[in-house]
Amino acid sequence: MKFVDEAIIRVEAGNGGSGCVSFRREKYVPDGGPDGGDGGDGGSVYLQADENLNTLITFQFERFHIAERGKNGRGRDCTGHGGEDLILKVPVGTRAIDNDTEESLGDLTTHGQKLLVAKGGFHGLGNTRFKSSTNRAPRQKTLGTDGEVRSLKLELLLLADVGLLGMPNAGKSTFIRSVSKAKPKVADYPFTTLVPNLGVVNPRPGQSFVIADIPGLIEGAADGAGLGVQFLKHLERCRVLLHILDVEPIDGSDPVESARAIVGELEKHSPKLAGKPRWLVINKADLMLEEELQERIDHIVKELEWDGDVYTISAYNREGTAELAVKLLDFIASLPPEEEVDADAEVEFKWDNYHQSANESVNEDFDDDFDDDFDEDDYDVEIIYQR
């Protein structure tokens, strides 16, 4: 299935049902009083994470999603049925953003997690709600409010512990093949990798981590060049980044300048991403003699002013890859646990406090001198004033 990691959709929560103006009419009960019921609340729209999904492609063809409207209230104190909530299934790792305000509504990082993205309209109140000692035949009601309408931008961010960075043909896909069961395409031309790939690494029995491979970066990627910049967001949730550096590029480019270009693109895209722990991994060590290799590594470390750990591997021959995987596992285990995001936290919705202000405004409209004893329908059949 085609990998799609972005989609823009429109969600509309259901409108609330309106209240009813009705009066009880029975034989020998001339003044039965009000019995108009409330309307039903409109259905809300939720996103729910589903581990069985891995792409947002379905939302490219279904862009409009509308929840059910609440039913209107009826006589005999019958409350309208609430609208059914609409639940949209999305892959685990999806982020919801308000496309108009760029406000982040939340992330769905665990299977079954739900996120409210459009709140249903509040129900209208029937005239029974407005009866009092001074207003015994109220003809007031409130209408149901409109449901929330949002234009949503859905972004799928892959959940991985380790992310791979590097120029095209640096050997990232070969590395992920050497340490996991993932089988991304490998060839001797740039941009062989067109979409992100995930692999599960098992350095020890019962212990594992997830590694993500994205298309290679080139200079100017933050400004739209190449493919990698649009996939950098998939590294935002990684705990550590592996900077794969080709010690002997096939095009004769300088590894130092390539490394600097990658760091520059990271800083342009996201300072937070650039500040993540980053390990330098020198790949294709089998292409040089040992003495030349060490001189090249010393030169690279000196020019980059690198003060962190440096690992030398040959992903093709799987030399040093198993040891690196074990060190990654130990490093990830030593990191403090990530802060848990409150799954119940909700953003502010426009109708949160509407019913309070609606009740206050209706009550202010009452006149104490209103003749509530008079009713032109006292000697007629039941009449329901219902919109």
Curated annotation (Swiss-Prot):
Protein's job: An essential GTPase which binds GTP, GDP and possibly (p)ppGpp with moderate affinity, with high nucleotide exchange rates and a fairly low GTP hydrolysis rate. Plays a role in control of the cell cycle, stress response, ribosome biogenesis and in those bacteria that undergo differentiation, in morphogenesis control.
Residues the entry annotates as binding GTP: 166-173, 191-195, 213-216, 283-286, 314-316
Annotated Gene Ontology cellular component terms: cytoplasm
Residues of the Obg domain: 1-159
CDD domains membership: Obg (cd01898)
Biological process annotations from GO: ribosome biogenesis
A GO term for molecular function: magnesium ion binding
HAMAP family on file: GTPase_Obg
EC number of the protein: 3.6.5.-
Assembly and binders: Monomer.
Record protein name field: GTPase Obg
Chief place of localization: cytoplasm
Source species: Shewanella halifaxensis (strain HAW-EB4)
Domain called OBG-type G: residue spans: 160-333
Cross-referenced InterPro entries: G_OBG (IPR031167), GTP-bd (IPR006073), GTP-bd_Obg/CgtA (IPR014100), GTP1-OBG_CS (IPR006074), GTP1_OBG_dom (IPR006169), GTP1_OBG_dom_sf (IPR036726), OBG_GTPase (IPR045086), P-loop_NTPase (IPR027417)
Enzyme class: hydrolase
Intracellular or extracellular location(s): Cytoplasm
Sites where the protein binds Mg(2+): 173, 193
Similarity-based family: Belongs to the TRAFAC class OBG-HflX-like GTPase superfamily. OBG GTPase family.
Keywords noted in UniProt: Cytoplasm, GTP-binding, Hydrolase, Magnesium, Metal-binding, Nucleotide-binding
Cofactor(s), names only, from the UniProt record: Mg(2+)
